[in-house]
């Protein structure tokens, strides 16, 4: 087996550095409140505009979203909402009484849900309706959505339209740790989130992990991983899309491409991000064997 390309490994020191950065930021925001958030928004994202967007501002920003894009987002929002509502309706409340012991199950939505939608490197439109529409279907009375300023401006128009369509009650132009802290501490809206959901980089993930206990979270997510095995008949576009679909989650999300020849590799690599480790083997081992060799933590 030979390597056609190798990606650098992530140093453990990077994780420790992220923990320290997040700890310091959360402490500063907890102490100085909204002003600290504004300072971080300007320092990290170059944003000095309104944090909490009004309905008229949202309408203005989304006015030029192409109709075909609106139609696609409308369709996606409805699909997610319909499924989530059916899922919610399939879970029933019940009450039992046995030998003097009463027990049961009640379904109560949280009061406030915070939905984080990253747009730092890519505009994750799907993250908007997957979180907000689901919360809406669950019956959450107040939904707060946050997204990073996009290219020095307010929230990406497509993402903002998705937030609006999915049913966000409050929208804040905030990204990163300052967004997570603002939702957890109830800054700008006066509503403290009971749960915070949504993907993000290592700083966002660390902020959610640190605040867990004060606020509920969906999951502490690490970097995504993907491994693709392709022979000479594989469609290079499909291979590239499968790789990018996971690696877009962050520049520390590794991707592996194993091929039986150089052909698929040479065609797929140019359309994939730089952080891809690629191995070409003359005789391809069985899939689970070769994957386990590189991903021992995921062994069956």
Question: What is the meaning of each model-derived region?
Answer:
Residues 1-3, 171-175, 293-300:
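Short acidic-hydrophobic, aromatic-tinged amphipathic segments that line or gate anion-handling sites
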Residues 1-111:
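N-terminal Rossmann-like NAD(P)+-binding subdomain of aldehyde/semialdehyde dehydrogenases
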Residues 94-161:
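Conserved small-residue-rich beta-alpha loop and adjacent elements
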